[in-house]
Amino acid sequence: MKVIVLGVLAVALGAWGDGIKVTLEGAVGRKMDTLCLKRAYGSEAKGRIYDEAVNAFRTHYDDTRKAGVGEAWTQGKGLWQGEYWGKTMLSSALVSEYAGDAAFKDWLRTKARAFVKEFQQPDGYLCTYKDRTFVGGPDKDGREVFCWNLWGRKYTMWALVELARVTEAPDLLEAASKMMDQEIDQLEKTGVRIENTGYFVGMPSMSVLKPLLELYRATKKPAYLDFARKIVAAWEREGNPPPNLVANAFGPKPVHEWYPQPAWWAKAYEMMSCLEGLVDFAEMEGKPRLLDAVKRIVAKLEANELNAVGSVGFFDHFTNASACPNATTEPCDVIHWMRVNRALFLATGEAHYLDSFEFAFYNAFLAGVYRDGRWGAHSVRSHGTSHRTAPHQVGMKYHQCCIDNMPRGFLDFAATAVTRGKDGVLTVNLYSAMKAKADKVGVTVTGDYPIGDEAKVQVEADAETKVRFRVPGWFDAVEVDGAAAKGPWHEATVPKGGKTFAFRFVRTPKVVDSKAKPGADPRRRAFEEAREDPGMTNLSRLTPAAKLVYGPLLLAKAKRVTKDAKAILGRDSVQGRNFTCTLEPIEADGVWGAWEATLTDGVTTIVREVCDFSSAADSEESGNLFSIWF
């Protein structure tokens, strides 16, 4: 892989699917390239980052460590170092495919084979837990035992499936199959049901559904589909034990009211991982009711869990996040909110799922990926001195759950940019700068969307071709070649040789009131995390405020565009006061887009410099003040 030493990766990374290769360019492509260099195939990534993930299988830290200072809470519990090899290699396998880098694929194949040879036991067991039978579940008093054994196995197995496909190594698929065979056999022989393992009412363990179905596609082993059916059946049990996802989907209650104390069971990342698998299962088995169940849960999340930065949940839990005057969201949640919406779009063709996907990506996701590519946020905040930088978890120096997932967020975006509908029509879904190749059709998108208001889409075709363009729901109007495009799709016939389409996105900035009510719980401890960042002390909002939305962009006041700290973190609010806003572009270094915002209700006028939320604080240093609140 060739690299020009200018801080920017020269080689293009492309996403493959349905015979389509997409290469991201522009600001999004550069940020992706930087992350993948630092976290996937650079020398540090292939050195100490990879080695630390492997070492977890030697030390068995997850279930044999001695609790050190400040770690008393871990005694007797199972931890999650076991997820990192799988997450790292899952991302790396996909990066190697998208980059088309044969040397990197060779490196991955060699490392994966050495890993399997060293750690997989003859019966297929491959895990960081020394005690394979420690899979969590209720203790003698009926309480859940904190344990991530099967969760870690899931990621290892998933990585092996993808490595086998990408590097053309059937022995790695065999290793994945042996892993799954051993897990199924162990659960059957010990009489343990998967829904009674792990923590958070079995959802981490049951989230194996998605990679299990991928393994079934690759091997056609009936046992895997049978096991998938058992998992899905466990979400519709009599007596309504939690989480009962399918049964509860059809009830009237929002997710956080399904059972008491949602902070102890309604884990966002793991539930959405299950939902993604359920979409796949519904499609595979031809079960429209199950697909409807996921659609209903997503609608419940949009109604009660959509947070102010475009993701769902409050710090990885579904606890009525929309009602809180502060917002904080894990990148893992953002990525899996994107993945669920992507899955529903591919299954249904309904464009509104792409609106949710797009807003989450441009705002909460990009904000959490630090611009140097080395690290990122554990929680993306609505405001503060910085986002909450990811801590080094469970004895690791170079891994953290959100960081290891981040390449997949970009890869999912690339794989969603251009797709084929179920009718075979090529569909342009996203308008970031990119190049795509689908059989004999080429697509090039230029412009600075969504900072700019225009994009050109050049379609090259050897023969007359129909193309479908998404009309994003974020705009007041969308024009194609000067004529209004009526959403959600604009269809056009491209003549032989090709055609260039000129898109204009018409938008006005919107002052959007918070759904939080006066007196709502600000959840200060979880939002501020002042033990890690004392500068966040007392920075929680105690009352709701409004935010500025400009098409699919969330705007923020930030130190990078203004030095007035009081203006950034001031407590005053235009919430409920019928303010409107106009924007004028301004020049500012270090941000993607910047504007002067003028807010007025006809009597009072407020002028503030703002930038795109993703640029406001996407770095590790503290004191980088920012806020979305007005």
Regions found by a protein language model. Give the residues of each.
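Hydrophobic h-region of N-terminal signal peptides that target proteins for export
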Residues: 8-17
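Low-complexity, Ser/Thr/Pro/Gly-enriched N-terminal "stalk/linker" regions
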Residues: 16-84, 102-136, 170, 229
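Extended, well-ordered alpha-helical scaffold segments
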Residues: 23-27, 31, 53, 101-117, ...
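Well-ordered alpha-helical scaffold segments within catalytic/enzyme domains
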Residues: 28, 88-102, 154-170, 207-221, ...
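C-terminal beta-rich recognition modules with glycine/proline-rich loops and embedded aromatic residues
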Residues: 29, 228, 294, 354-363, ...
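Solvent-exposed loop and edge beta-strand segments that line ligand/cofactor-binding
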Residues: 66-85, 136-156, 188-206, 241-276, ...
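Catalytic-core region of carbohydrate-active enzymes that cleave or remodel glycosidic bonds
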Residues: 283-304, 324-373
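Solvent-exposed beta-strand/loop surfaces of large extracellular or lumenal domains
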Residues: 475-494, 511-519
